[in-house]
């Protein structure tokens, strides 16, 4: 039986960041990943500038496939273009990006075990027991960063309600010739489904394209996505992959005795844009900080003492996700009114992109919308 200070389950951004931080602070740490890295991931591969600011090391240039400072928005016959002086996101291949993050954790002293699927997590008086497809491990703290379908989360909370899960499908497609180069910027299409959006993101020799929808519109996602590809003259040459995204901003338990949830496993994702990497990195660091703080002082990592992690997450980004959820609900209930308002002026989109750059947040956007909505609505009627 392997015994550790910390077991991290999941080799995505949340898990890799948490494992690296724990190992750097001298905790005996192992990261368990069910796949063999690098492995494919359902993701557009967009990393916001705000997310990059949370990393203490720059992303290597060879991993970055495109830098984006131009946003093209489409809504029916309307189009809006926002050009910023600084990038608001970069595009990567998630398999390579995640592998790089795990390599950083390994270089910092974390042990990495691949191809071990966690099948059960049992907290007890002597620590937390983790059973995998191959072995049994114990640790004083387990950090569950194993995604939206988390096994670790079963020891913390009930499964996500279906109404609290958005859905997306995506694929990467070889580039085709067109009048306007794909590399000019990201393209986002609204209004083609009642609530949600479709995207085309440029990469080196292909484009990442997909469709994300709110919970009420998940039944016809694949058909709607294929119609979109046909309209754009894109032919799928890779598998279409789909998965759920938890709506952040909803109060859920994220800790139990000896257990911390991070990233999608904790429900930390942007309910307005679907961004998850930013909150995976943030929560991974906070999870590691909580584990290091308690274990280094020989404080029992029970539910009560780990509550500091939940409070830190709320103050760091949780309150802002609540504001994002409120704004996304407004779009869900009044899509035509709000999209009409957004596409009648550059200001709402420009303000929204500032969030991706880390210059503002959803609470400030909410206040901005309260102040400016009456005038914007008059101009859109």
Predicted segments with their positions:
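Beta1/beta-strand and adjacent pyrophosphate-binding region of the FAD-binding site
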Residues: 1-12
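Glycine-rich FAD pyrophosphate-binding loop
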Residues: 7, 23-42
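N-terminal Rossmann-fold NAD(P) dinucleotide-binding loop
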Residues: 15-16
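A conserved beta-strand/loop capping segment in the N-terminal third of enzymes
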Residues: 46-100
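Predominantly flavin-linked oxidoreductase catalytic cores and closely associated redox partners
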Residues: 104-235
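FAD/FMN-dependent oxidoreductases across multiple families
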Residues: 118-120, 216-291, 295-296, 303
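C-terminal helical "tail/cap" subdomain of flavin- and related membrane-associated enzymes
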Residues: 292-381
């Amino acid at each position: 039986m392997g015994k550790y200070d910390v077991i991290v389950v999941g080799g995505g951004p949340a898990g890799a960041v948490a494992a690296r931080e724990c190992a750097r602070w001298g905790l005996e740490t192992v990261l368990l990943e069910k796949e063999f890295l690098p492995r494919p991931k359902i993701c557009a591969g967009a990393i916001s500038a705000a997310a990059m600011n949370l990393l203490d090391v720059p992303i290597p240039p060879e991993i970055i496939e495109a830098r984006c400072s131009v946003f093209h928005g489409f809504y029916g016959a309307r189009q809006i273009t926002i050009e910023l002086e600084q990038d608001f996101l970069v595009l990567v291949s998630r398999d390579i990006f995640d592998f790089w993050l795990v390599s950083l954790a390994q270089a910092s002293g974390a042990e990495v075990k691949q191809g071990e699927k966690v099948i059960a997590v049992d907290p007890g008086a002597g620590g937390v027991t983790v059973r995998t497809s191959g072995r049994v491990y114990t640790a004083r703290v387990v950090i569950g960063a194993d995604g939206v379908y988390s096994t670790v989360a079963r020891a913390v909370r009930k499964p996500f309600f279906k109404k609290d899960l958005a859905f997306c499908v995506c694929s990467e497609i070889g580039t085709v010739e067109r009048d306007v180069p794909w590399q000019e910027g990201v393209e986002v299409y609204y209004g083609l489904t009642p609530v949600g959006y479709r995207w085309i993101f440029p990469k080196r020799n292909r484009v990442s394209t997909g469709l994300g929808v709110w919970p009420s519109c998940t039944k016809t996602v694949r058909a709607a996505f294929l119609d979109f590809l046909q309209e754009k003259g894109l032919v799928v040459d890779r598998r279409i992959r789909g998965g759920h995204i938890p709506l952040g901003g909803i109060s859920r338990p994220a800790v139990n005795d000896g257990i911390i949830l991070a990233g999608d496993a904790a429900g930390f994702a942007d309910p307005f844009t679907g961004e998850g990497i930013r909150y995976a990195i943030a929560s991974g660091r906070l999870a590691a900080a909580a584990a290091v703080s308690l274990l280094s002082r020989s404080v029992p990592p029970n539910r009560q003492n780990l509550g500091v992690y939940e409070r830190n997450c709320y103050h760091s980004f949780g309150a802002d996700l609540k504001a994002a959820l409120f704004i996304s609900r407004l779009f869900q209930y009044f899509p035509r009114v709000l999209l009409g308002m957004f596409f009648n002026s550059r200001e709402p989109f420009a303000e929204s992109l500032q969030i991706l750059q880390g210059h503002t947040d959803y609470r400030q956007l909410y206040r901005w919308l309260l102040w400016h909505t009456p005038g914007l609505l008059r101009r859109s009627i």
